[in-house]
Amino acid sequence: MEMDLNNRLTEDETLEQAYDIFLELAADNLDPADIILFNLQFEERGGAELFDPAEDWQEHVDFDLNPDFFAEVVIGLADTEDGEINDIFARVLLCREKDHKLCHILWRE
């Protein structure tokens, strides 16, 4: 898979794309109670944070997760408005290279 450093999503675009995918698929992958909780609390405590892919993704995918091209977006709720997300609803792995649409999601169980 050949990728171009000059053809990547920005960090903001990556966050936005991951959140859009999350919203589109949440109803099929989360319990109804979790969806209600997320929707009620997101305005005050919700967020999406961008990270380099965690090492445990290697258990789920069989390709190199070069952080120049792959990002992990954690979507969930924090205890406080500016706190770290500690109630995780989904972890989204995205390829940031625009010509390689690739996404994997680990949903809350």
UniProtKB/Swiss-Prot annotation:
InterPro entries for the chain: dsDNA_mimic_put (IPR007376), Put_dsDNA_mimic_sf (IPR036763)
> Organism, per UniProt?
Salmonella paratyphi A (strain AKU_12601)
Function of this protein? May act as a double-stranded DNA (dsDNA) mimic. Probably regulates the activity of a dsDNA-binding protein.
Protein name, please? Putative double-stranded DNA mimic protein YciU
Residue ranges spanning the membrane: these are: none
Q: Which domain of life is it from?
A: Bacteria
Family in the record: Belongs to the putative dsDNA mimic protein family.
Give me the gene this protein comes from.
yciU
